[in-house]
Amino acid sequence: MDQWDWEKIIRPDQRNYTYLKTVVRAVYLAVRRIAAQVTKKYPALTFDLPREITFVSTKELEKMYPALTPRERENAFTKTYRAVFVYQIGWPLANKQPHDGRAADYDDWKLNGDILLWHEPLDCALEISSMGIRVNAAVLEKQLRQKKELDKLSKP
């Protein structure tokens, strides 16, 4: 697996869900364009990607599939919608557990998520991107408090 990170400087007024959705849609459009180029060059390779990506929060997934594990929820939803952005990963859900573990000092757990695509040959959702808007000072402290890692505030 190859993992590439990129950062984008944003204004404080862009720290919101609307802006995050705009970036997710742009990333997904790039994926669709690349898939089309691959299929054009290699016709045997086809991709069943919907025109639009579907957004779902971890809370919504938990309400829809309360008896399933987080991974099973992602698979069930992604199998139906094919391209999904699961957002708000990190805070505990109604069952008192987070959907998935996230570092407290990286992304804002209210403004993060994973792009998942359904992969028919493996019959499962594949995560192609994990992304989010970085923490600010207030969010950093709140998330460190949640994970009982406030000592990190005193470390450079």
Predicted regions and their residues:
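Low-complexity, flexible helical/coil segments
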Residues: 19-22, 40-45, 120-124, 152-155
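Residue-level marker of positions within ordered structural domains that often coincide
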Residues: 11, 32, 91
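Residues forming anionic-ligand binding surfaces in small-molecule and nucleic-acid pockets
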Residues: 1-11
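A translation/RNA-centric and nucleic-acid-associated enzymatic feature enriched
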Residues: 61-156
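Long, well-ordered alpha-helical scaffolding segments within enzyme catalytic domains
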Residues: 18-35
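Inter-helical turn/loop segments and adjacent helix faces that build the functional surface
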Residues: 10-18
